[in-house]
Amino acid sequence: CFAVLLLEVQGQGMSAKVVALLGILVAMNAVLRFVESAVPGPGGFSPIFLLIVLGGYVYGARFGFLLGALTIFVSSILTGGMGPWLPYQMFTAGWTGMAAPLCRPLVRALRAEGKAGEAAVLALYGGLWGFLFGAVMNIWFWPFVSGPAGQYWEPGVAFFEGLRRYAVFYVVTSLAWDAMRMAGNVVFILAMGVPALRILRR
């Protein structure tokens, strides 16, 4: 997976400046995640999504995906957090950055470029991904655990029944945890979004 990401960086004609910036942002986020693992915040509260969201928003979907995926990979080396969950973390963090440019039309419609409204739109986006990140992450282990009937996957379960069971499982096991991630994303983007965007656009 890491080799594919490196080939993507080399094969897409990224300028040396953009590749260097990608490396710097990945390193910054990896250090933030290392600190986060040493001094954990409440629930899923994490500072790393600030740069993933803003980087993808400013530099595009490919840059955002690489920033998210490489952040998770490099930080997992620092924290020793490698396991079967790692590909899910990498792809989901990558998707968080990759989809960030979808906020651009709304920002333009609101004429909020460079203003607090731009950060507000991105904060709402980051908040949504606070929940989506956890919802995708749970899939790596949900089919392999067992518990109360009506919450877990079983062979032969119909598609919509599986969705219903997963929704119940998510609410019971993860909603409160992911709400902390959502809150962290919103707080960091609202507090630092405008100056951070200004720096990234230089």
What are the residue ranges of the model-derived segments?
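Generic transmembrane alpha-helix motif of multi-pass integral membrane proteins
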Residues: 6-8, 48-64, 99-103
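Lipid-exposed faces of alpha-helical membrane segments in multi-pass integral membrane proteins
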Residues: 2, 24, 28-31, 70, ...
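Interfacial aromatic-anchored transmembrane helix boundaries in multi-pass membrane proteins
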Residues: 31-47, 70-104
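Hydrophobic transmembrane alpha-helices
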Residues: 1-54
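Membrane-embedded alpha-helical hairpins and interfacial helices in multi-pass inner-membrane proteins
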Residues: 38-47, 82-87, 104-202
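Membrane-interfacial loop-to-transmembrane alpha-helix junctions, especially the N-terminal start
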Residues: 15-22, 60-64, 196
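Alpha-helical transmembrane segments and their helix-entry boundary regions
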Residues: 64-68, 122-123
